[in-house]
Amino acid sequence: MTEILINGNFLCRNLTGIERFAWEICKRIDSLLNSSDRVSMLVPANASNIPSYAHIAVVRSDKEIHGFSAWDLGVFAKACRSRNACALSFSNTAPFGKTCGIAFIHDVYAKVFPNDFKSLYDKLIGAYSRLNYYNICKNARLICTVSNFSKKQIMDYYGVAEEKIRVIYNGFEHIHTVNADESILEKIELRGRKFYFTLGSLSLRKNLQWIMKHAELYPNELFVISGAMLKNVVPSELEKIKLLKNIILAGYLSDGEVKTLMQNCKAFVFPSYFEGFGIPPLEALACGAPIIVSNAASLPEIYGSCAHYIDPFKPNVDLEALLAEPVSSPVPLFEKYSFDNSAKKLYEILKEIGR
């Protein structure tokens, strides 16, 4: 088998959906490997939390990662060439040209909504993202993505042949390994109170505006928002949110704190207008919470009849009435969207490419 070299850049990033996917899939791929498989991972020198694998060979680089271009186009690309290995990249980035290998594009957000990138810094991030989409679509041996919605967008925007793209779904199993941390209920004074919960990095597509405008219209409803602040959230919006007494900005929370809020909320609200998959509502369902999600992008494909739907641009919605409407059991979703199943699918791809 040709060596597969995994891009360990995700080990130096905050744990959002893309990084979660990489962590969970690599852990399960490791359990599927046998002695004839050659799979390694190149890890930056400044990665602090390095996984322990039984079969994936962890190669520690002496170079740190401080910019994706320097790592992906330099250190990682050079390692792929010197080892004659096929690259496997999970994070929407990959080496340029013939060393691109197998690469994941989780979504093409920067291509579809370029105007969401407001500041000069964000415009550079958007341009770099689009450059990576183009490189992967042109040069990858195989493209993986996380929904049929994203697959179609890759085909439509970049003219990629359908047979060059494989859909490998996200999963939810990790939430069951997390110990709930109920101290968060006292920390932000939620014990005994009814509230809606939303989770996600506070980028424009997560649609913080919907929550803000809805909270203004329904002052008796309480919302808890968790997520790290990003540069492309308009500061004036955040200042206005801080003035609303029925919104709690909880900041970045631990997995245990998030699990507790999912277990105790009236519903998990996810008004994002663009998602390649959207893991948080699946986590919430696994915690027993009803979910209210946007009717846009991949979300109807992923959640089907198991979710309550809202228009991401119309915040005047009676959520109590919406929650009274019947939805289907989420059990079929747990059977369909599984990291275990997705790892098996990716392993078959690696064997196919590595022959």
Where on the chain are the PLM-derived regions?
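Carbohydrate transferase catalytic cores enriched for Leloir-type hexosyltransferases
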Residues: 1-355
